[in-house]
């Protein structure tokens, strides 16, 4: 067994494990950690606990520190910078005449990289755009093309149930959803009834799948 904490970097983002060392870290704390992207500010969603060794990707990186007041202030400043970066990138996309839709801008905590998330129908040659952005921000630039489900997860919204979208609220990862699940639950197969804001089958169809499968088994038993 390995002692870990679970950390998220975005709302309903994937949970990553880190070594808590001897620090007293609890759920809701903010921590500074090193990731493949650089130094980042994360929120603890699972306090110190043990998990099976095969659930941990080695080497398990240690927490650098529990975020202090200065760290929290810097993170807030980064959020403001992201708004400006988004605006500038959108202007540059128009300037270069690229058929891409900008979704979000994100600074790493140490400002060593700015990531821009976008959607597009096909592949985009954004090499000149990257050069232009690098000359403005004087740091590393990464453009990442995402799908419609990821776009909805980032932006959020309200589902047809009247509640905040599952993918933006609590789902860490997308799960496979099939039309078979809607059929087993006797739902209307009208696309407008079983599709989410993203236009894909609603993630919540998966929530009751197991219950319906068990019910069908009991009904079919003599």
Range-by-range predicted roles:
Residues 1-188:
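Acidic-enriched and Gly/Ser
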Residues 217-222:
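Residue-level detector of conserved catalytic or cofactor/ligand-binding positions
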């Amino acid at each position: 067994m390995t002692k870990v904490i679970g950390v998220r970097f975005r709302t309903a983002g994937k949970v990553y494990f880190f070594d808590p060392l001897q620090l007293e870290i609890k759920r809701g704390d903010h921590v500074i950690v090193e990731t493949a992207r650089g130094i980042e500010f994360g929120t603890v969603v699972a306090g110190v606990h043990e998990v099976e060794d095969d659930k941990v990707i080695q080497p398990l990186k240690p927490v650098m520190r529990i975020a202090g007041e200065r760290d929290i202030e810097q993170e807030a400043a980064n959020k403001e910078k992201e708004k400006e970066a988004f605006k500038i990138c959108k202007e540059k996309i128009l300037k270069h005449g690229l058929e891409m839709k900008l979704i979000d801008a994100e600074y790493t905590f140490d400002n060593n990289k700015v990531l821009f998330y976008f959607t597009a129908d096909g592949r985009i040659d954004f090499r000149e755009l990257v050069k232009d952005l690098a000359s403005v921000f004087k740091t590393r630039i990464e453009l990442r093309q995402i799908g419609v489900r990821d776009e909805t997860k980032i932006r959020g919204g309200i589902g047809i149930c009247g509640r905040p979208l599952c993918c933006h609220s609590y789902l860490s990862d997308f799960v496979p959803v099939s039309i078979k699940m809607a059929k087993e639950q006797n739902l209307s197969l009208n696309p407008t009834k079983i599709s989410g804001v993203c236009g894909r089958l609603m993630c919540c169809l998966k929530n009751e799948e197991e219950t319906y499968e068990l019910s069908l088994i009991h009904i079919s038993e003599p």
